[in-house]
Each structure stands twice: as structure tokens, then as C-alpha cells.
Amino acid sequence: MNTYAQESKLRLKTKIGADGRCVIEDNFFTPPFKLMAPFYPKDDLAEIMLLAVSPGLMKGDAQDMQLNIGPNCKLRITSQSFEKIHNTEDGFASRDMHIVVGENAFLDFAPFPLIPFENAHFKGNTTISLRSSSQLLYSEIIVAGRVARNELFKFNRLHTKISILQDEKPIYYDNTILDPKTTNMNNMCMFDGYTHYLNLVLVNCPIELSGARELIEESEGVDGAVSKIASSHLCLKALAKGSEPLLHLREKIARLVTQTTTQKV
């Protein structure tokens, strides 16, 4: 049962406006969602912040998000704050997100980290459809719990799936299952003493494998690696003992990518 009596929905569709920049063509949302009007921090790159007017996700909360980024749009989507998953008791909270990125469009999806509280159970499913000319920078950061309270890996279960298709052909699939009841989260194959995890995917972005590795090596307090996936796209995964090192690493990569992507001809 949803806290808001119905599934929480968000719809966003963008297009190129009269001035040649990305604008909102259509949008719709139900509580707790809201959207800020786009602003333009750099050239023709628009930035839209997704707002959730709530303390976080509770038992039974279900979110349905659909984002359609129009052809030639250049857009960065952010969130307002860290996302909290509260104690879901004997239930769970969920999110289904479908993203379409049109021809010659660029999307930088950069939400703040996800924090599962004690006994939290969360299910997330993201499907992203691209064209061959689409560019994507997509990330998620997962925290071990309320670190300042030493509440580490006390959540029930966290399961997120990311599926990326290019011209209807799958090019990337990630299935992250964190279940402290059945897995030692601190073993060397999992968090290995770290508390924050970054998963970043780059499709058709102007950054080389060697360049991404250099940025990881330059990042103090970060242990990570990057590899090529289908069609020479990149997947980067990193661990740290705080959110700031991972957010800084992600921002450095995004800055490098957008410097090229948003250059006016």
C-alpha cells in the first residue's frame, strides 16, 4: 500500500526551444514529486532538479518515473538531497524508471546518494532506451546505511537493476543485490571495509578509458576501476568511506564530458 494512496508518478518530456536550448515540453507529477524549472549553467546545457517533498521512502511507497529527452537536447538531471529509505517493516519501497534519450541528445543523470536505513527494503528497476547517436552519463551511489550512527549494513535488502538499450539492442545490464542477511558485506568481493559505492555508465561520451583511470587514481580515498562494455562504452565502479570523494570523482568526469558535449560550433 502506498503512503500517498496511489502510485507516485512523474512524467517529463523535453524538446529544443526557440532559442536552441532544451526546454520542458510537457510534464506531470503526483505527490511527493515536483520539478524545478530548467536553468542553464553552461552554454546550451539545461539542468532540471527533481524534488520529492517527503522525508523519504516508506513501506508500500511505489514510484513510476518516465523521462523522455527529445532529439538534440542537452540535459542534466539532479536531485535535491540524499534519498532516504526508511524502515519498511515487513514490506518494501520500489521505483520503476523508464528513460528515453532521443537522437543526438545528451543526458547526465546525477542523483544524490541513496541511504537505506535499518530494516529498509528497496527495489529499483531502470530501463534506458538510446539511439545510436545518444549520449548518456548515468550513475547511482549507494551508502551502507546511516554511517554517522555506525548503522552499517543494517538494512533488510536492496535490489537495483539497470538495463540500457541502444537502437533496441541491449548493451548493458547491471543487477545489484545487497542482502546483509545472506552475504558478508565487508568481504573483499563486496564493500571491503568501505561504506559508499558508485556505479557510473558512460555511453558515447568523449572520454577515453585511460582518462577515466587517471581521474580515479587522482581521487584521494577512492578505490575503483573502469572497463569497456559493448561498443567501447565505459562502466566505472568505485568505493570510498564517504560520499564526497565519489561525488567529486563523478563531477570531474561529468565536467570533462560536458566541456566537449556543450561546446558551440
Curated annotation (Swiss-Prot):
Keyword field: Chaperone, Cytoplasm, Nickel insertion
Domain of life: Bacteria
One Pfam family here: UreD
Intrachain disulfide bonds: none
InterPro entries reported for this sequence: UreD (IPR002669)
GO CC annotation: cytoplasm
Localisation per UniProt entry: Cytoplasm
GO MF term (any one): nickel cation binding
Main location: cytoplasm
Quaternary assembly: UreH, UreF and UreG form a complex that acts as a GTP-hydrolysis-dependent molecular chaperone, activating the urease apoprotein by helping to assemble the nickel containing metallocenter of UreC. The UreE protein probably delivers the nickel.
Family that this chain belongs to: Belongs to the UreD family.
Function of the molecule: Required for maturation of urease via the functional incorporation of the urease nickel metallocenter.
Identification of the protein by name: Urease accessory protein UreH
Organism in which the protein naturally occurs: Helicobacter pylori (strain J99 / ATCC 700824)
High-level lineage: Bacteria, Pseudomonadati, Campylobacterota, Epsilonproteobacteria, Campylobacterales
